[in-house]
Amino acid sequence: MTFFERYFELLDGPDPHSSLELVADDVEFSIQWAADGTRKSRQFVGDRDELRGLIDAGDTEGWAHYVSHSGVSGDVEFALGETRWDTGERIGTFLAVAELDESGRMRRYMVARSPVLAFPSER
């Protein structure tokens, strides 16, 4: 199981805060979020406290992350996937990258999400 498969399984599970077990204390992140097909998007940046705040504020019911492609280069892992409603309907496509520390925890995290573009699913 890849890092992102483990991370998203915890994030989407009954205790989303358990995903923080895979996050380094000194994490830095940037989340690029496009809600629709317009040119407007939002960026969320911060550290572990801000990531916890996003989990606190997040609406995580009724949908989940699905990793379709992944790769590893040294201590960097990549994942391409989709968010889907529980019905299976696609919400959006995401591309995530993480630099892992020596303990395998996420040290740097960047993800972009858009509902506009879909890729063929491998899994």
Report the location of each language-model feature.
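A solvent-exposed, acidic/Ser-Thr-rich amphipathic alpha-helical stretch
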Residues: 17-20, 24-73
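A beta-strand edge to alpha-helix "cap/lid" segment located at domain peripheries
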Residues: 49-123
